Amino acid sequence: MATNQTDSSTDRLTHPLLEKLAPLPAAAPHLFAYSAKIVCGRQGETGCCCAAGVRPGVYATEVNIQNLNLVTAPVLKFVLPLINSGAVVAREPDVADPATLRGHQTDVVKLPPLAATMDDCCRVAEMVLGAVPSGDAPLTIAILTIVSAFELSVSVVYTANPPGGDGISIDVEYLQPRLLGLRGQG
């Protein structure tokens, strides 16, 4: 006699970190994911860490997230540090693995309809270190990953100053979402 069996893995999200977004609408076939490069802090003239082509200067990044939906959007954010306060922590063959994140490196925020929030260098430092450092922070390079069941508007503002303070560079990028398949899909 045949029975109606259910495989519990079909109900489980494909990565344990995504469980923080649960419960998701049953009909949701995928999640929207955004990957923002973060460059923060001071890179000195005598580079501390062979910083992969980062020139001397002061760097800042701000990530803006807006929920352009008419429902509240749960948003999962996590930081994958590559260079942490001047120390290279994820140069190949080493990797920044989301499965090994500490609690303060992840955050879930519920964005009301049409609401916005931002993550800047202070917030990224708090997520990576557990607290905001005082004074000038050494170079930190990381990936801020943003995941939601709803499509969001995500922009990133990068600023850089040379060591002498002569001039400033500002760049704004708008991030397109990547689709993450749920429950074994894509």
Residue positions per predicted region:
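Gly/Pro-rich, tryptophan- and cysteine-flecked surface segments typical
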Residues: 2-186
